[in-house]
């Protein structure tokens, strides 16, 4: 059964129209409670396949399944009412053919009520993006550093370090935009290259490890809140240290239980007088 999309959400055309205007604010969300906390403050809630690492403890995003993405995206839609919900198509669900991509994207949107899908890839994915958009599937592109290519690349490496690399990233973004993507995430790309791309490409460029001159920014929420491990990518600014708060709260709770300070009588049910 599909989720119901509530009225009042930021639309795909509204996001596309933000090119060169007030920067678009995006954060990841994987659960209904977090979506509810973030929704008043952001324009886009990205249900990223990063949930494989953040929620499930995988080393990469590659083990994430379509069923996982559907379950989490539906929760985010239920927990929010304002932001546009964009959902990653996971590895292995869209590169075989445009028809495979359409089948899985249509299922994802129908079963979750999300507003758009996101897929990784440049010039080689232009045909697929055009196929999807021609059939009513809004697509957000993703170029530059592409986490789903980690097997081919041997890890995570910033792009745009050479003239050839910079030209390739720009050509990828241009191809994705011309194919019909309404917005493009640009990840892990040298700042001058990212700034120039933002000026050159007709649709909003959302940076993550890119440039302050992009049309918007996205971060993994757990990174931004200091919840996800000790490793901090260079491009992350921590706005809180919630891992410490959680640890302190758990320690206080454990001490109260062991010393029988919790539960106190006010936490117990008693007969009314």
UniProtKB/Swiss-Prot annotation:
* CDD domains documented for this protein: KPHMT-like (cd06557)
Which molecular-function annotations from GO does this UniProt entry contain? 3-methyl-2-oxobutanoate hydroxymethyltransferase activity; magnesium ion binding
Record keywords, A-Z: Cytoplasm, Magnesium, Metal-binding, Pantothenate biosynthesis, Transferase
Q: What is its main location?
A: cytoplasm
Q: Which residues bind 3-methyl-2-oxobutanoate?
A: 49-50, 88, 118
Q: Sorted alphabetically, which HAMAP family does this protein's record hold?
A: PanB
Q: What class of enzyme is it?
A: transferase
The biological processes this protein is annotated with in GO are: pantothenate biosynthetic process
Return the cofactor note field: Binds 1 Mg(2+) ion per subunit.
Give the source species.
Granulibacter bethesdensis (strain ATCC BAA-1260 / CGDNIH1)
Residues annotated as binding Mg(2+): 49, 88, 120
Catalytic reaction(s) noted? 3-methyl-2-oxobutanoate + (6R)-5,10-methylene-5,6,7,8-tetrahydrofolate + H2O = 2-dehydropantoate + (6S)-5,6,7,8-tetrahydrofolate
Can you say where in the cell this protein is located?
Cytoplasm
The organism's taxonomy opens as:
Bacteria, Pseudomonadati, Pseudomonadota, Alphaproteobacteria, Acetobacterales
Q: Which SUPFAM superfamilies match?
A: Phosphoenolpyruvate/pyruvate domain
**Enzyme Commission number(s) of this protein:** 2.1.2.11
One Pfam assignment:
Pantoate_transf
Q: What is this protein called?
A: 3-methyl-2-oxobutanoate hydroxymethyltransferase
Cofactor requirement: Mg(2+)
Q: What does this protein do?
A: Catalyzes the reversible reaction in which hydroxymethyl group from 5,10-methylenetetrahydrofolate is transferred onto alpha-ketoisovalerate to form ketopantoate.
List the active site.
187
**Which GO cellular component terms, listed alphabetically, does the Swiss-Prot or TrEMBL entry include?**
cytoplasm
Q: In which pathway does it act?
A: Cofactor biosynthesis; (R)-pantothenate biosynthesis; (R)-pantoate from 3-methyl-2-oxobutanoate: step 1/2
Task: Fetch the PANTHER family from UniProt.
Answer: 3-METHYL-2-OXOBUTANOATE HYDROXYMETHYLTRANSFERASE
Which family is this sequence assigned to?
Belongs to the PanB family.
Task: Summarize the subunit comment.
Answer: Homodecamer; pentamer of dimers.
């Amino acid at each position: 059964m599909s989720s119901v999309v509530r009225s009042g959400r930021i639309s795909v055309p509204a996001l596309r129209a933000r090119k060169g205007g007030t920067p678009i604010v995006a954060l990841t969300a994987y659960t209904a409670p977090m979506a509810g906390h973030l929704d008043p403050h952001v324009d886009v809630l990205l249900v990223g396949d990063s949930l494989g690492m953040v929620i499930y403890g995988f080393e990469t995003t590659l083990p994430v399944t379509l069923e996982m993405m559907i379950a989490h995206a539906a929760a985010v839609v239920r927990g929010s009412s304002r932001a546009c919900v964009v959902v990653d198509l996971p590895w292995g669900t869209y590169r075989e053919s445009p028809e495979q991509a359409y089948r899985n994207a249509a299922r994802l949107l129908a079963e979750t009520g999300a507003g758009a899908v996101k897929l990784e890839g440049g010039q080689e994915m232009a045909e697929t993006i055009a196929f999807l958009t021609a059939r009513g599937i809004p697509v957000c592109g993703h170029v530059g550093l592409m986490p789903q290519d980690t097997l081919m690349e041997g890890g995570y490496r910033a792009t745009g370090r050479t003239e050839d690399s910079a030209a390739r990233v720009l050509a990828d973004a241009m191809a994705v935009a011309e194919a019909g993507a309404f917005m493009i995430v640009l990840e892990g790309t040298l700042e001058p290259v990212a700034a120039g791309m933002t000026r050159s490409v007709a649709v909003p460029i959302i940076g993550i490890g890119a440039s302050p001159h992009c049309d918007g920014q996205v971060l993994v929420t757990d990174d931004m809140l200091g919840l996800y491990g000790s490793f901090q990518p260079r491009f992350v600014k921590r706005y809180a240290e919630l891992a410490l708060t959680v640890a302190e709260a758990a320690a206080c709770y454990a001490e109260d239980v062991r010393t029988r300070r919790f539960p106190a009588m006010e936490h117990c049910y008693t007969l009314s007088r």
